[in-house]
Amino acid sequence: MSRFFANGSDSESESSEEEVQASNFNKAANFQFSDDEEEVKRVVRSTKEKRYENLTSIIKTIRNHKKIKDIPNTLSSFEDLTRAYTKALPVISKEENGITPRFYIRCLAELEDFINEVWEDREGRKNLSKNNAKSLGTLRQKVRKYIKDFEEDLARFREAPDQESDVEEGEGEPHDSDGDRAGADSDDGVGAGTGKLAELPKAAKSAPTKAVADEDDSDDSIDWDSDTESETESSEDENLYQNMRERFLKRTTEKEDKDDDKRKDKRKEQKHKVRKRAEDDEDGEWETVVKGNVVEKPKMFEKDAEIDIPLVLAKLIEIMSARGKKRTDRRLQIDLLFELRDIAEQHALGTPISVKIHFNIISAIFDYNQKISEPMKLEHWALLLEVMQSMMKLLLANPDIIMNESVAEEHEEYVTAPFYIRGCPLAAVERLDDEFTKLLKECDPHSNDYVSRLKDEINVVKTIELVVQYFERCGNNNERCRIYLRKIEHLYYKFDPEVLKRKRGELPAAGTAPSSVEVMDKLCKFIYAKDDTDRIRTRAILAHIYHHAMHDNWFQARDLVLMSHLQDNIDAADPSTRILYNRMMANLGLCAFRQENIKDAHHCLVDLMVTGKPKELLAQGLLPQRQHERSAEQEKIEKQRQMPFHMHINLELLECVYLVSAMLLEIPYIAAHEFDARRRMISKTFYQQLRSSERQSLVGPPESMREHVVAAAKAMRCGNWQACANFIVNKKMNTKVWDLFYESERVREMLVKFIKEESLRTYLFTYSNVYTSISIPSLAQMYELPLPKVHSIISKMIINEELMASLDDPSETVVMHRSEPSRLQALAMQFVDKVTNLVDVNEKVFDMKQGNFFQRGNMGNRDRGYNRNQNNQGGNWGGQRRDNRNQRNRNQRGHHKQQQQQQQQQVQTIEEE
């Protein structure tokens, strides 16, 4: 064996090296290696180690990005992490039996908490840069979507999360698990030729034992151990690789590597535990470090103080005096008020003082959120509901307590009945209702959060009902009108199916609770009689009409609209009242449509739909196309006026009802005035839809709701009622529109009936010039209508002079009079009108070129342009053109008459001679 492999020592002399070179001249030359090259070990790592190392490095990167809130890089690192995990899935399935590593679950949990924390910080989110804000939304969506596959693992992790020390050691978990599994086989896997390797685990195990035994040593000794760690490793390497050949041989197994990793990880773990125990012994328990100076909670009263009403009131005034001041801890203020309430109840100071403290707690909760436009936190909202209901129950249970804002503070009475307290529960419940609306607007309407917040409406309505009972007992008319309006606004848009069942006789009317229509009628009539302000009365009328329309009380709703004259002065109302008016008109149109009043439905909806922005008029959202027309401040104000999602009216339903109503009115009118050049449009929007469809060279099958209505209109123009009905009433239209109606089957039957009748009218208008007489039974069979109904339709058309015909009852035929012009005659008349207009235009152009336009009597003397006739300046140009033509004709007639007179005189002279 060569001495190169036999001896790995560096202490050989130069002479010995020369001897070796001289004796082995023809053999391979020896090489000297630097210390760096000798320290590099060739290691064959398993696939699992590679994958896990990649995952842990990415997790470290994500943690670093989270510390500095670098959200774009966090997003890119998260994408890298998901890709790395996908690559590691085969290894996890094989080695871990498909169980996700705990360090990976910990990373996902930390990332989710980080995103939620940043997302809930509204002030911090506003200060984020555009790139960070955009990346935050993308990261939130991706993480929420990704962690759905790990919900069970995350739930188990959150039940028993790791401690901080475990989190730091978590990166070594994969290696620990490998080492534990490989530890049992480490002794068997080492051959006889590597005896030093077999002895190494024993030496490694002795080091932790010694470290545990020396737990009472000082921190200096611990630091000394950590400093000499590298020296120990180098000495172990020297002892291990006594033979240079062993150092450079490629290892045939991975168990040696696992042994090394196991030794190092255990050594680090033991030293870390020793250091942690030493710190625990010195410092005791862990304490949370609070930023800034720790403010001690002020003491309520002195230890030996006698707690009575004046002392509690003085303390209450002291706490509330800090209200609205700078650097006031509003959370601490609320806590102090709750503590003061508990003290007052413990010392039995009476219900009046408890009510006073309750009211101040409500005020403090309202003050916690300084920005009025933003909603309050959910914890404060729940607290507010609880305190408000508790206060109202105390007021109702004690009739001798009177709370009113007109009571002066010096006249408050807490000792003898009747008790007078300064405060306004009406203002508190109004603010509570406004906060509830803001909470609903802030939530995503398609999320579970919105449903959870909407459930709170039950408690809000209960609170309003408690306030209603209180003011019915001791309130004035103005206060009762205000609280009644709040109750109405929570009731008017809700549909009560029992009302329709009672109307049809399906439910007994007596012996049951009053229906919502009866409650609305009672509340609104009180406001009509007692209200002094126009706004409350106007809003009550609008809500009353809306509620009647919801329950198909068409005539009551219509009469209220006509008698109140709201349409005359609604433009002077505030924006929220105008929004309520638009909502009322939309719902009134739907009610008219359900009650077969097609023309009234069209009249109610035309003002909303002709503008092209019903979404904005109903306060159901802002159109992005009109964003440039409003400033940021205007947009913010308009968003505050938006209606909560559960109060929205379906816009597609609204548009479909409007277009169908327009079709049933417009198509027969077009057929009746086909050759009338001056016919007016009933519905401009529908007419535009129809014309745009006719301009298309190739029209496919209808897909959207508008296309279905346009296709139905084309079929109706030909009198084909079956095709028209199939386009309007089909599976797709039922799902989109008609199933949204209560009793949708009745609405569909009504639609088919109207389509048959209007198709019959259109057919008679279109083909009346073809027939000399038409059989009424054949028309009834063609349109599947009863014979009396067909007779009635034709009679109305004849009476209204829409159809020039007469009825022959014995033969049951309609005899056409042919008084209207034929198609050729109508086209000829149109042609004559157009030619006449063309002649007028040509004459005007000719007059301008010839100069006759400036004759005297039209635009003044041409030679005296500065002295033109002021009476004709800017007059009717068509009249001037006619005057010019008449003047020329008169001049010509006068000239001819003079010539005739001259000729007659000449003839007489000749005869006399």
Swiss-Prot record:
Its main location: cytoplasm. Belongs to the eIF-3 subunit C family. GO terms for cellular component: eukaryotic 43S preinitiation complex; eukaryotic 48S preinitiation complex; eukaryotic translation initiation factor 3 complex. It comes from the Eukaryota. Residues 172-184, 244-263 have a biased composition (Basic and acidic residues). It comes from Drosophila mojavensis (Fruit fly). Component of the eukaryotic translation initiation factor 3 (eIF-3) complex, which is involved in protein synthesis of a specialized repertoire of mRNAs and, together with other initiation factors, stimulates binding of mRNA and methionyl-tRNAi to the 40S ribosome. The eIF-3 complex specifically targets and initiates translation of a subset of mRNAs involved in cell proliferation. Residues 645-821 form the PCI domain. Pfam families: eIF-3c_N (PF05470), PCI (PF01399). This is Eukaryotic translation initiation factor 3 subunit C. Component of the eukaryotic translation initiation factor 3 (eIF-3) complex. The eIF-3 complex interacts with pix. Residues 264-276, 887-898 have a biased composition (Basic residues). GO terms for biological process: formation of cytoplasmic translation initiation complex. GO terms for molecular function: RNA binding; translation initiation factor activity; translation initiation factor binding. Keywords: Cytoplasm, Initiation factor, Phosphoprotein, Protein biosynthesis. HAMAP family: eIF3c. InterPro entries: EIF3C, EIF3C_N_dom, PCI_dom, WH_DNA-bd_sf. SUPFAM superfamilies: Winged helix' DNA-binding domain (SSF46785). It is found in: Cytoplasm. Residues 11-20, 162-171, 214-239 have a biased composition (Acidic residues). The modification Phosphoserine is found at S34, S165, S177, S186. PROSITE patterns: PCI. Residues 1-22, 157-285, 856-913 are annotated as: Disordered.
